[in-house]
Amino acid sequence: MILLEVNNRIIEETLALKFENAAAGNKPEAVEVTFADFDGVLYHISNPNGDKTKVMVSISLKFYKELQAHGADELLKRVYGSFLVNPESGYNVSLLYDLENLPASKDSIVHQAGMLKRNCFASVFEKYFQFQEEGKEGENRAVIHYRDDETMYVESKKDRVTVVFSTVFKDDDDVVIGKVFMQEFKEGRRASHTAPQVLFSHREPPLELKDTDAAVGDNIGYITFVLFPRHTNATARDNTINLIHTFRDYLHYHIKCSKAYIHTRMRAKTSDFLKVLNRARPDAEKKEMKTITRKTFSST
């Protein structure tokens, strides 16, 4: 299985090139790039007001207001410091870099810029991991509508944090492959007792979402992660956040890859069958033809 990159490579490569050229004393060039990411996220890299010595990185998330309710603004201030500026129009967060005043730790700064989406997501997880660490119970469940028709729920208890993703499968094939995929996670936990518990429910929401407006339907699935203190403590939580916030994309990416692989194998097998059939086909009988005088000749 393939782990999706947590960082955004386009941001990192663009900023790294800009920093490298600036450090070499090269004349700055204009940049204007707009590109998308998973979960309807949109990025914009540009020169604000046409100033080529400044590079702005902006991100738009449809669900950012829900993240703000869980401390997203405070977390971003802590991570990005003075690079965080007022967001440009149409975006939720903007970072500004001055090519005439390069930071000392350029590699670290570039990497953190590439982690912008992850860091926006991180606030809700850090908040509930902290609740669990402090033994708080009864806090309201976090509800993040991270896609138009899909939702993430986060809830903390004294001994665990429960994260539930709802997801929509486009067709019956996706449901079948998704079930097989989730079964592999259950098998994986048997091999590693330190892995979190992973549960999958189809059509109906899990008990954790009882008496909520969670969606119900033949194409609806729910993936539940039960995270224990070994997954949420201060040393492990960053890696946990890195992995869990991309899980929905990871699942659907592998469903698409599986369907493409099956389709490729079917085409290859069909081609092999056709070759066998062509070899087994009998040669056409040669028809003997004669002239009016009964002499034989062959047609060409």
From Swiss-Prot:
Belongs to the ARPC2 family. InterPro entries: ARPC2, ARPC2/4. It is found in: Cytoplasm, Cytoskeleton; Cell projection; Synapse, Synaptosome; Nucleus. The gene is Arpc2. The modification N6-acetyllysine is found at residues 275, 295. Keywords: Acetylation, Actin-binding, Cell projection, Cytoplasm, Cytoskeleton, Nucleus, Synapse, Synaptosome. Actin-binding component of the Arp2/3 complex, a multiprotein complex that mediates actin polymerization upon stimulation by nucleation-promoting factor (NPF). The Arp2/3 complex mediates the formation of branched actin networks in the cytoplasm, providing the force for cell motility. Seems to contact the mother actin filament. In addition to its role in the cytoplasmic cytoskeleton, the Arp2/3 complex also promotes actin polymerization in the nucleus, thereby regulating gene transcription and repair of damaged DNA. Component of the Arp2/3 complex composed of ACTR2/ARP2, ACTR3/ARP3, ARPC1B/p41-ARC, ARPC2/p34-ARC, ARPC3/p21-ARC, ARPC4/p20-ARC and ARPC5/p16-ARC. Interacts with SHANK3; the interaction probably mediates the association of SHANK3 with the Arp2/3 complex. GO terms for cellular component: actin filament branch point; apical dendrite; Arp2/3 protein complex; axon terminus; cell leading edge; cell surface; concave side of sperm head; dendritic shaft. Disulfide bonds: none annotated. This is Actin-related protein 2/3 complex subunit 2. One of its GO terms (biological process) is intracellular signal transduction. The lineage of its organism: Eukaryota, Metazoa, Chordata, Craniata, Vertebrata. It comes from Rattus norvegicus (Rat). One of its GO terms (molecular function) is AP-1 adaptor complex binding.
